[in-house]
């Protein structure tokens, strides 16, 4: 009877009515503002810091080579990674500010700027990393120039650029998802 109902099912209703309760609650939705890596969060700051650290490493490794200035792809990588460094550093600074004032970055105009800037720098970074990697493979495998050149240094610089690109691609995707969810 009624007394056994409370003992048999102390937490919820009767099992045959549980389906009705689930329909009323609706689907579980993960709020996009809580997505790890969103701008203005510790995760977002970590992504930006990784971007500018790898970009800076790529530039430093490339420009410490004597011959890099003689090859367009290598100069392009240095320029693209310098731009990536500046962009990511500015956005990391904005993330630090948002964390200090304990507010997110909900402004859709600002998020739109982040997405477009991320896409531009990501495209430039990927193109630069690919061209540098391609030229380095050409020098190493086809022309056998690596005996006289710093091919390992060029490969390492391209690798750092790829790492930076992966992080900017993640940031841009997260920011885009946040933007379209508003």
Curated annotation (Swiss-Prot):
Location within or outside the cell: Cell membrane
Residue intervals annotated with topology Cytoplasmic: 1-41, 95-108, 181-182
Ranges for region Disordered: 1-20
Extracellular side of membrane: 63-73, 130-159
TM stretches of this protein: 42-62, 74-94, 109-129, 160-180
Keywords (A to Z) from UniProt: Cell membrane, Glycoprotein, Membrane, Transmembrane, Transmembrane helix
GO cellular component: plasma membrane
Membrane topology qualifier: Multi-pass membrane protein
InterPro entries tied to this protein: CASP_dom, CASPL-5
Presence of the UniProt keyword Glycoprotein in the record: yes
Pfam families named among the record's database cross-references: CASP_dom
Glycosylation site list: 70
Family: Belongs to the Casparian strip membrane proteins (CASP) family.
Family matches, as PANTHER family: CASP-LIKE PROTEIN 5A1, CASP-LIKE PROTEIN 5B3
Subunit structure comment from the entry: Homodimer and heterodimers.
Name of the protein this chain belongs to: CASP-like protein 5B1
Species whose genome carries this gene: Picea sitchensis (Sitka spruce)
Phylogenetic lineage: Eukaryota, Viridiplantae, Streptophyta, Embryophyta, Tracheophyta
């Amino acid at each position: 009877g009624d007394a056994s109902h409370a003992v048999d099912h102390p937490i919820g209703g009767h099992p045959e009515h549980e389906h009705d309760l689930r329909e009323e609650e609706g689907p579980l939705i993960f709020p996009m503002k809580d997505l790890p890596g969103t701008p203005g969060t510790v995760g977002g700051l970590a992504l930006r810091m990784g971007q500018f650290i790898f970009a800076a490493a790529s530039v430093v490794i490339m420009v410490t080579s004597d011959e890099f200035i003689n090859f367009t792809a290598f100069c392009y990588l240095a320029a693209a990674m310098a731009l990536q460094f500046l962009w990511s550093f500015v956005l990391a600074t904005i993330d630090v500010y948002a964390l200090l004032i304990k507010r997110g970055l909900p402004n859709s105009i600002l998020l739109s700027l982040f997405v477009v800037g991320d896409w531009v720098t990501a495209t430039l970074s990927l193109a630069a990393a690919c061209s540098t990697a391609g030229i380095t493979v050409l020098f190493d495998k086809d022309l056998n120039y690596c005996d006289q050149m710093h091919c390992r240094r060029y490969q390492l610089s391209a690798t750092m650029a790829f790492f930076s690109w992966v992080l900017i691609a993640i940031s841009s995707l997260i920011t885009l998802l946040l933007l379209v969810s508003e």
